[in-house]
């Protein structure tokens, strides 16, 4: 059993299975609340404000940054993305577990802004297996694959910064390990 204050951060390289693990974890544990990110990008068709994202204009977003209103935030492709602090703290204050599935840089920011959170790094069984998974997706160009793999090498070097490392070799075993880690 892990002692933490309700905030769970899951990160790891692209292709490691974070998204799949998080989806299964949420399905089996409806008491866990997945944090909704804020963004300045334009909503895509069918996206709902407050459900898919909190859609903000750049001024609103920067105002929140200035007021330390995000646990973490970043700019990507000309838009801002961030995890609103208030909604996470509100859920935690009423005893809910809050889950963030974020990138390495965001996890590092959260460690500074909310150090009592529990951070889990999802790792592949090997770099070769990670490459195989990324290539098997069939969605990326060779250039994009190489970019993901180079980024993954950097991210894997950071795994010891985390409270726990879960190797996603077999999905069900990795999921069970995560559930044991966050059980309170």
Swiss-Prot record:
GO molecular function, one term: guanylate kinase activity
Domain Guanylate kinase-like: 5-183
Principal location listed in the UniProt entry: cytoplasm
Location of the protein in the cell: Cytoplasm
UniProt binding sites for ATP: 12-19
Annotated EC: 2.7.4.8
A Pfam entry, by short name: Guanylate_kin
Extent of the signal sequence: none
Domain of life where this protein originates: Bacteria
Catalytically driven reaction(s): GMP + ATP = GDP + ADP
Stated family: Belongs to the guanylate kinase family.
Protein name, per record: Guanylate kinase
The gene coding this protein: gmk
């Amino acid at each position: 059993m892990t002692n933490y204050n309700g905030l769970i951060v899951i990160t790891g390289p692209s292709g490691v299975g974070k998204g799949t693990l998080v989806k299964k974890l949420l399905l089996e544990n409806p008491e866990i609340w997945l944090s909704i990110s804020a963004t300045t990008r334009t909503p895509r068709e069918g996206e709902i404000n407050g459900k898919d994202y909190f859609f903000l204009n750049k001024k609103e977003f920067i105002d929140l940054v200035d007021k330390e209103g995000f646990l973490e935030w970043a700019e990507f492709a000309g838009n801002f993305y961030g995890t609103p602090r208030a909604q996470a703290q509100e859920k935690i204050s009423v005893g809910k577990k809050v889950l963030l599935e974020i990138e390495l840089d965001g996890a590092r920011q959260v460690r500074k802004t909310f150090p009592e959170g529990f951070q889990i790094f999802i790792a592949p069984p090997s770099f070769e297996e990670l490459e195989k998974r990324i290539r098997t997706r069939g969605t990326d160009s060779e250039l994009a694959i190489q970019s993901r793999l180079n980024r993954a090498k950097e991210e894997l070097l950071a795994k010891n910064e985390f409270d726990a490392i879960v190797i996603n070799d077999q999905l069900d075993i990795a999921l069970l390990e995560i559930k044991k880690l966050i059980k309170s």
